[in-house]
Amino acid sequence: MIERFLTQTKFTSEDDYAKHLHFIVPENFNFAYDVMDAWAEEKPDKVALLWTSERGEEVSTTFREFKEQTDRTAAYFMQLGIKHGDKVMLILKRHYQWWLSMMALCKVGAIAIPA
């Protein structure tokens, strides 16, 4: 996937890297769609998110599950009236839902304000 966003991926030295590292950023780049959802297509059963609580609880989510959950969350946010360009303060402490909400807000085009 990295080839989609870099003009060159192999370098012979640190100097070569410094001189020739150039990013390709699509005009309407959206990390949630262009990276996370693309990974859901390429490797749907790989772990996208592994979250562990202080009590040792674990939540493991594949890229497919992550895409499905962020799609549903984005639809819910839009149902609430959140739209492209809206600023949304996200207060979820250290819960795994924070990551789902961040990506869902990206999908909506809203501006997430982590708090």
Where would I find each of the regions flagged by the language model?
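The conserved SAM/SAH-binding core of class I Rossmann-like methyltransferase domains
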Residues: 115
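Low-complexity, small/basic-enriched stretches
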Residues: 1-21
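Structured binding elements
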Residues: 109
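Conserved AMP-binding/adenylate-forming core of the ANL superfamily
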Residues: 45, 49-103
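Active-site diphosphate/adenylate-binding microenvironment
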Residues: 18, 22-27, 94
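Anion (oxyanion) recognition and catalysis
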Residues: 106
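A short N-terminal helical cap/helix-turn-helix that marks the beginning
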Residues: 1-8, 27-49
